[in-house]
Amino acid sequence: MEARGKQDLWIRQKPEVLDVLREQAIIQSAESSNRIEGVTVAADRLRPLVIGRAKPRDRSEEELAGYRAALNWIFSRKRAVPIAPEVLRRLHALARGGSSGDAGEWKKRDNEIVEILPNGERSVRFVPTSAKDTPRTVEMLCRNYRAACDEERVPPLLIVATFVFDLLCIHPFRDGNGRVSRLATSLLLQSHGFEVARYISLERLVEESKEEYYRVLKLCSERWHEGKNEIVPWWNYYLGLLRNAYQEFQRQVESVGARPAKSDLVRQTVLARVDRFTLSDVAALVPAASPQLVKKVLAEMKKTGKVRLAGRGRGAWWEVIR
């Protein structure tokens, strides 16, 4: 992938911008990966939990802080971490916040992946590997992954994509399988020199395309147990996700000045709006920037005639002047 060749140049040339992108990505990743699984926290608690030192107040906040801890563990690795069952269990324990009774433990009962039909009925979409066979199957998955990497006959991105897909089909934990799969994605990409997950939230991109994500997952899991499933649609989705991430990475790095990076990101986000927006809309898109900074940038842009404000209080909204 051509963009990977540029990432080292970007890292050397614009460290201040990357610091902001890194902070923004970890906030978005923790929020999106948990929200995909139905775990949400109040907007005003997001930044203190992920970037600050705020103590979790409930189970949802524990899981958000846990995901942050898992990402911190991944990105602090100085050398590639050989994938193994204990690594996956560690990621699960971290992502679950550490206080869940089965954090870091394989499932003890068989599970099913269920979808809700438009009429409200529940339908079994997929039956994962049994609890009894899970430890052996995960061990085999990790061993096959390492062997494929050593053989170098298949491009590493396809090896990573296949590993993540098989992990989702095994569904080795009672809960949190999706989050572990996304953490494993970042860990394995990093081991092959693809650093984009540090700066652009892959979890956010998955959330933004989750209908396609689940459609492809369902399609490609058919006949998985017999080893006769079609994997190419999943590869296409996965590679498209990475391409989008690197394209966004390039746009972010090349379109903002080195200082002050946060203000530039806010300004760039505002100018990209095509409809009305509120201060909280911008703050959600640029979580690395404080609400005070967003207010300051909007005030500056209003003064220079780039945006206008309508209404007051909670009903106030902004609009870009074209």
What are these regions (language model features)?
Residues 1-322:
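FIC/Doc superfamily catalytic core
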